[in-house]
Amino acid sequence: MARFDRGSVSGVACGLDVPAIEVRGLSFAYPGATAPVFDGLDWTVPQGAFALLVGGTGSGKSTLLSLLKPEIAPAGERAGELRVLGEDVADMDVRASAERVGYVFQDPENQIVCETVWHEMAFGLENLGVSRDEMRRRVAETSYFFGLEDWLHRDTDTLSGGRKQLLSLAAVLALRPRVLLLDEPTSQLDPVAEKNFLHALFRVNRELGCTVVVATHQPRPMLEYATCAYRIEGGRVREVADLASLGGREELLASDACQSAPGAAPGAAAIREGWFRYDRAAGWVLRGLDVAFSAGAVHAIVGGNGCGKSTMLSVLAKTAKLQRGRMMRGAASAALLPQNPKALLVAETVRDELMEWASTCGYDEAAAQEQAARLGLASLEARHPYDLSGGQRQLLALAKLLLIGPELLLLDEPTKGLDLASRRIIARALRDHAKAGGAVVMATHDLDFAEQVSDDVAMMFDGEIACMEPPADFFVDNVFYRA
């Protein structure tokens, strides 16, 4: 792909001294909110930067980025100026927005709309009225740049999470935006897929001259590519003077918090010779899976996107049934937190969400308020769940499940989109659940979390468990899967 022309956008002069992003005096409040998200925020990002945007869960990172993209900007009261390459965002039509600003969401499922990779690549170009010849040229060129040509005719729903996120990036860049905004783009990727995605993003920045801004809670893997970083806190943005300061490894729990009770623990669930596939014409996702999980412990499952982790959790939750083999859970109650917490959120307010199962599960409002406070949700009870940040929705969904007290707690990527403080809250909650005799099984790409919080770590590969060991033994000899 040719280097994007930094000198102009749609024929409008745009010198290198013009910032890629310029925000002046931005104030913004969601409808019905008691306090604004931003109050007089100023922010400037130079052209050609690979910039990181860090900050706590709910600090406004996603809100700030989405306000720069008119088509997805949230409703609310707004004041101040937002400019991209010198043009006011409020004056951009759909074409101008597409040519200036590309946006990649945290979850590729929220972005991919077409059945095949080729059609997904062409979808945005079709909507802009690009000629068929130009469309084919751009799809071909972008596919070669990202190495998509071997799976160009695959169905999008057959792709791994890593490939879906790479496809989302490629489809956006086929529109040739000058500024690329990404919201937690690697939070659902395994370590190898994350490295591949970040390398592709680095090439976009360096080889194509595209300004890249990544909102993230996990900046450490990106520091080798970043040219600058900004922290959002208290409704304001400030530049991080020392990039290396973002690379430290933080403790999640006290050193003795993961000590299990002595003695043999009773079994909570097991799968024996489990085979499962989603379609008779498709390949097996689980292939003779043998695994057992004990009560009173936190079990972490790691492995590449598409290796079968989520499927195994669905089998344990009885939302999927093995075609061969047995799943043994006895009378133990179970609850599953899926990758997308929105699947559990149906009410109009946080309070109503927490009280949804109160009558059937036997807890009162005092218990709900206590759980909300424990998970950092006490000040959000009047908010609509969909007005929360992705991390706050994750905490809310977990709070709902903890209120019903399942003996088997199943979690699919429980820490995605969470800052250090929120990860600590979840770590403590999972250890407390295990200490009370519950079993926790979590599929995760957060290796630091797995090492510090779990009693054992299993690697899933090709539908089976390749190994299961205590964290100290599991991580010692790994090359790619290292905490």
Locate predicted features.
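H-loop/switch region of ABC-family ATPase nucleotide-binding domains
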Residues: 216-217, 444-445
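A short, surface-exposed alpha-helical micro-motif characterized by mixed small hydrophobic
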Residues: 222-224, 450-452
